[in-house]
């Protein structure tokens, strides 16, 4: 099989570009040479906050990328076209129209790999009748649609693919020596916090990590309010324990960044030992590893409209962290049945309750084992390769 991957890799860094890089690395590094990969790095945006905008510069770049794709088709006989479709955003869907109008006639099979949700729902509820017609004409009937979880089969089905398969996102194991090093440190911190909670030890800080786009709909402000509420509970019980929220990521909206900074100065987010919320900005790979290694729990209380399968959740699982996550779209599907860390959306009180329950404990739900079974790059590679090669037998 000859596969053209028409999708961009970092920069800018976000879940979609990260997973495209994982796909390329996995298919190219494998001893299995049954898939020959060609890549058009179709980067249009310089920064994350530029992703949803439209401009003549982007149109020119897109036309150039399409010409390169057609040239690779004619020069190397590449006959399978891999593409990451837009979420339900009008400008992004129009981009997809242009790509398919120019490229689709040259390729035998079209493969969609959804890294964001909502295009099917948008076609039904947000698109004009003529937009639905054009979308079905240009985007409909792909040979294969790859989705991140069973929850998204219905959304992908709106474009009438011949086949839909589920392939979760992945990450390389960041701590293969987890049992010998990181787990030991986590157990020691949990023991110290347990002693502080029982009144028999010095002050201990429980670190909760938020690692995502800094955006209200991702649950950032709910996490902030939850940490304020939980610290108030601990202070009322006169316990020598505190909870600190470490926030890492770029802000999507300047107004929300201003609101966040103003919130940090309020009395309920500061105690005699310092701030209870620490903002670290965008975390590069080294900083991210540092924050995950020192964290005692992870929170992502998202109700983001286009939420898919956050890579940060996979990395938190790989680090064996207890996780608080919302019952939103695909997110519960990623966790073991009956997982105790699930909360409703927009519920800071529930987040505080779950974090309170995690104090002095390490992960008891086997989330690292969940990562090793389902979300490693090896598991991803096996599933994605099987899905792609199955097209050859049709």
Could you describe each region identified by the protein language model?
Residues 133-196:
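Donor nucleotide-sugar binding/catalytic pocket of nucleotide-sugar-dependent glycosyltransferases
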Residues 282-283, 290-295:
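Short alpha-helical donor nucleotide-sugar binding micro-motif in glycosyltransferases
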Residues 318, 322-325:
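Short hydrophobic beta-strand element within catalytic cores of glycosyltransferases
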Residues 293-308, 321:
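Acidic donor-binding loop of glycosyltransferase active sites
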Residues 4-5, 183-218, 224-229, 246-249:
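Conserved donor-binding/catalytic core segment of Leloir-type glycosyltransferases
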Residues 360-392:
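A charged, aromatic-enriched C-terminal amphipathic alpha-helix characteristic of glycosyltransferases
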Residues 249, 258-286:
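Nucleotide-activated donor-binding/catalytic signature segment of Leloir-type glycosyltransferases, i.e.
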Residues 337-348, 356-362:
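Conserved acidic donor-binding segment of nucleotide-sugar-dependent glycosyltransferases
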